[in-house]
A protein has these predicted regions:
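N-proximal low-complexity "stem/linker" segments adjacent to membrane-targeting elements
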Residues: 342-406
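Short, acidic, metal-binding catalytic loop of nucleotide-sugar glycosyltransferases
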Residues: 405-414
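Catalytic binding pocket for nucleotide-activated donors in carbohydrate/polymer assembly enzymes
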Residues: 3-7, 20-21, 26-27, 31, ...
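Glycine-rich, basic loop-to-helix element that forms the pyrophosphate-binding segment
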Residues: 449-466
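Extended catalytic core of nucleotide-activated donor transferases of GT-like folds
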Residues: 2-116, 127-130, 238, 426
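Conserved donor NDP-sugar-binding/catalytic core segment of glycosyltransferases
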Residues: 483-515
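Conserved nucleotide-sugar donor-binding catalytic segment
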Residues: 524-605
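Short aromatic/hydrophobic "clamp" motif used to bind/position activated sugar donors
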Residues: 471
Length: 618
């Protein structure tokens, strides 16, 4: 008697952890187990298959799906909850499978309504997952967030911003498909367990509107002492809310999280009770016993010489489907709306070009424009800064003071501000001066441009006047968090080979937090799809100088930061991702974003013409 777990080379790393637990459980029950990748193992005497449908079916060719004969010798472990994508597909397999186990208690009655008998797999404490051991330990990470990215999860993290003020976080939301670079940057296996053993709280948010409990995230967290703060789940037995984990409604999560993080005694109580419970009531031997019973029954029913036939027993992995690359989207026939948006964008570009030229002529009759005027601010004997914050300004009188004050409130001492006023026509410069005068401790300079040259030229001027090796780019309508500059500078210190560093940014609208930007690790592969990194990043000045700074080519108007990331990628440069909230991006006003998103055809065309790697198959 032996078992073969059918896995996929393209599966989510969480399923690798589950397979490891199943192998260990069967070993405790005296059943040797192997793992077959991307196909079912060849039939043999006493062989029983174990299949987690969600780990296998999405990642292999249909020819590698189990046949009816194979299913009759297969134990299913269904990880999906009722209503979740993939649940009905797993249920269809369960109609023929020898036995079906589920992780979600709510799946048992749902499958029963379909005439399928399913048993709850008593998964709990897995020794291989537990690197903590229950001993007292320092936990430097206040909050960890793991799992696939969804707009809902992103908004929950954005809403939790106040609870994270002054605290450390590890925000790892995964973008699918899982590319090699993304997989390498995503905590899994031993790295994930180490993260959980160093985290005080793990935040669980339903990916969609369903209320299923995420067992594959919760159990490794409990095994390593990370307390679960979950959105209100439906079926979570045998765990008890308030004893083994904490829960709250979606819009109450931030308040609940803040209260939990501020209560060390409560954290310790929940941590201990949850850990002791899964060790005592859900040992891995119980999983082994349940699987052994099902394996014995399956072997007896099939007979030792079943010769069960299946499909081809050769690996047949399937390349994961991802978003359509921009080069393919561009080849699609444009709609009437696309044509109108493209024409409107061209009109706006021409209008801005004309306005800029008129301002130049107004400033100087011959159109050349006066030179920039530089005014030093703050202490004249300020030490060499570690970070220069370049703030570009053009007619943002209502928001510039907030942006500058956020720099002054940074917990990094060695910082200067370089304010570049791009010939504002309102009282933006006066407001900025007043804000800087209130912060005498903040050194730097004001660069007053004689004529408006546009955003990329203003940023390049700021970088040219910066004294620090690290330059953070801040627009006049955004704010940097108190710890943001320090986190990014520390990242560049740790990774001398990185050319820039960026962190997670909250997107905030008039009604409050909306979602996240810059939440994915550096991977040039994704530049074929979209610009996923905001301009608010910390640049190594020497690297920016190598690529020539921000382009002033009007073909990239509104896309200057995207062009910079593509330029750096084409030079083999890289960015260091910091999985913490570092800044707020404000929306709901007229901004360069409106021009960027109005029409994308011209921008993509210019990028494809300049950077060959963007045209390569994604």
């Amino acid at each position: 008697m032996r078992a073969s777990i059918t896995a996929s080379s393209g599966q989510d790393p969480r399923f690798g952890d589950l397979h490891e637990a199943l192998v260990d459980a069967m070993a405790l029950a005296g059943v040797p187990a192997e793992v077959s990748v991307d196909c079912f193992a060849a039939a043999g005497d006493g062989l029983v298959h174990v299949l987690v449908p969600g780990a296998y079916l999405p990642h292999v060719h249909p020819a590698a799906y189990p046949s009816a004969d194979q299913l009759r010798r297969t134990l299913l472990v269904v990880t999906e909850s009722p209503g979740a994508p993939g649940f009905d597909r797993s249920a269809a397999l369960a109609e023929t499978a020898a036995a079906t186990f589920v992780l979600d208690p709510g799946a048992v009655p749902e499958l029963a309504r379909k005439g399928i008998r399913a048993r709850l797999l008593p998964l709990g404490h897995v020794p291989a997952w537990d690197i903590w051991g229950g001993a007292e330990s320092e936990r430097p990470i206040d909050l960890a967030v793991l799992g696939d990215f969804s707009d809902r999860r992103a908004r929950a993290v954005a809403l939790a911003g106040p609870a994270l003020a002054g605290r450390r976080a590890a925000l790892h939301l995964v973008r699918k498909p899982l590319t090699p670079a993304t997989a390498a940057a995503t905590p899994s296996g031993a790295a994930k367990r180490e993260l959980l053993a160093n985290a005080r709280v793990l935040l669980l948010v339903h990916e969609r509107e369903g209320r299923s409990f995420d067992w594959l995230e919760a159990l490794p967290a409990i095994a390593n002492g990370a307390v679960i703060q979950s959105e209100q789940p439906s079926d979570h037995g045998p765990l008890v809310a308030g004893r083994h984990f904490e829960c709250a409604g979606f819009y109450a999560l931030s308040t609940a999280l803040e209260g939990l993080l501020a209560s060390p005694d409560r954290l310790e109580r929940v941590r201990s009770e949850a850990y002791d419970f899964i060790r005592a009531e859900r040992p891995l031997s119980a999983v082994g016993a349940a699987l052994r019973e099902a394996i014995d029954s399956t072997s007896a029913a099939a007979g030792h010489a079943s010769g069960a036939r299946g499909r081809l027993t050769v690996p047949m992995p399937l390349q994961a489907e991802g978003p359509t690359p921009a080069v393919e989207r561009l080849q699609e026939h444009p709609s009437e709306g696309d044509v109108v948006r493209a024409a409107l964008k061209q009109a706006l570009v021409r209008q801005r070009r004309l306005e800029r030229e008129l301002r130049r002529l107004d400033a100087d009759g011959d159109g050349a424009g006066p030179d920039d005027r530089v005014v030093e601010i703050g202490s004249s004997d300020a030490p060499q800064p570690r970070v220069s914050v370049v703030v570009t300004l053009y007619n943002y009188a209502n928001t510039i003071a907030g942006a500058l004050r956020s720099v002054g409130l940074s917990d990094l001492d060695e910082v200067e501000v370089v304010l570049v006023d791009d010939a504002s026509t309102d009282d933006s410069l006066a407001v900025a001066r007043a804000a800087l005068e209130e912060m005498s401790w903040l050194p730097g300079r004001i660069v007053e441009r004689g004529a408006n040259g546009g955003l990329p030229a203003a940023r390049n001027a700021g970088i040219a006047h910066a004294r620090a090796d690290y330059v953070f780019v801040l627009d006049a309508d955004n704010v940097v968090h108190p710890g943001g500059l320090r986190l990014l500078a520390d990242a560049l210190d740790r990774e001398p080979g990185a050319d820039f560093a960026y962190g997670v940014i909250r997107q905030v609208g008039p009604a409050g937090p909306m979602g996240l930007l810059s939440w994915a690790p550096w991977d040039p592969w994704w530049l074929r799809i979209d610009n996923y990194i905001d301009a608010m990043a910390m640049l190594r000045r020497s690297s920016v100088e190598v690529v020539g700074g921000y382009t002033s080519d009007e073909a990239f108007m509104g896309w200057e930061d995207f062009e910079l990331w593509c330029n750096m990628a084409s030079h083999g440069m890289s960015g260091e991702f910091v999985p913490e909230l570092v800044a707020d991006y404000r929306t709901g006003h007229i901004s360069m974003l409106s021009l960027t998103t109005l029409d994308t055809t011209d921008g993509w065309t210019a990028l494809f013409d300049r950077y060959e790697f963007l045209r390569e198959p994604a």
